[in-house]
Amino acid sequence: MRYVVLILCMGLAACSGGPGEAVPEVVDVPFYPNETRELRALIEAAALENDVPVALVQRVVIRESTHRPGARNGPYYGLMQILPATARSMGFRGQPSDLLDAETNLKYAVRYLRGAWLVSQSDMDAAVMWYARGYYFEAKRLGLIEETGVDGRKVWPD
């Protein structure tokens, strides 16, 4: 009888997944105040396109507008509160009010954030600081003017 139980236990063990079969953990991050499913998708796409962490883009969006695409504060526009002149240096060619569109704002502001990410050497706190304060002179000092595109001469894909 013990022999039969041992054989059955070995058979069950052979059928179970071994330690080499890891099941990916699905993390369902709750939405931030004012964030929508569509807005999250746009943020994730802009982060991916510009090779910056989604968490960094989210942090700037929360800091600047709490996920409100129509946010205005003086000369600053939209989700990431970008100046039209800064957006133009990143390839923007529209009217300032066009920056109140979430997709348009993210396209140009995340390009600019990418430069802050490069200047910060992948330090999230420093990237937020450089985004808010401007990083032209730091990019120049580090020899990153061309790579960041902050001089306005870079040809951006549409």
Report residues per predicted region.
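Sec-dependent bacterial lipoprotein signal peptides
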Residues: 1-15
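Solvent-exposed loop/turn segments at secondary-structure junctions
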Residues: 65-68, 86-89, 134-137
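Bacterial Sec signal peptide processing site at the extreme N-terminus
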Residues: 13-32
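Substrate-binding/active-site groove segments that recognize
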Residues: 75-92
